[in-house]
């Protein structure tokens, strides 16, 4: 019974680590992924080693499977809380909605406005890049000012240039100056 509990706990730890390592790889953070992979591999070997010691012990196998499933749930939760990376929202509007554009820019979001031809009239599209950790804030602003907007989103693997890059460099310089002054 203690072995089954140990296997379950190891899986609860292992699978979220596996999830984080996978996300780091997808986000092109290979060195961090490799470091996390060391821990992941060690836990995997220990856990599976206990299961393979006695394949007739069905409690160990069930603990492994249930722990894996519970670990997936926990890994998904942790990933949402960490919100690693960036996201782009494309917001389609019937009018230019300067109020929304101004509020987004005032809040520190990079916004590009496009004018396009819809089936019956001119339409406007906003391309907004944000840290995933600020996605909720972004959606609250959009929903408050333009609740009927059509939105689609996708995650960004990498980017270069633009407002967001300048803002990040500016923040990094400010931190360096603050650090040297302290």
From Swiss-Prot:
Annotated membrane topology: Multi-pass membrane protein
Listed transmembrane segments: 6-26, 32-52, 58-78
The keyword tRNA processing appears for this protein:
no
Record flagged with keyword Mitochondrion:
no
Signal peptide coordinates:
none
Which InterPro entries would you find in this protein's record? DUF2179 (IPR019264), DUF5698 (IPR044035), UPF0316 (IPR022930)
Task: Spell out the Pfam families in the cross-references.
Answer: DUF2179, DUF5698
Q: Which GO terms describe its cellular component?
A: plasma membrane
Q: Which UniProt keywords apply?
A: Cell membrane, Membrane, Transmembrane, Transmembrane helix
NCBIfam families, from UniProt? PRK04164.1-4 (NF003193), PRK04164.1-5 (NF003194)
What is the designated name of this protein?
Answer: UPF0316 protein BA_3420/GBAA_3420/BAS3170
Source organism: Bacillus anthracis
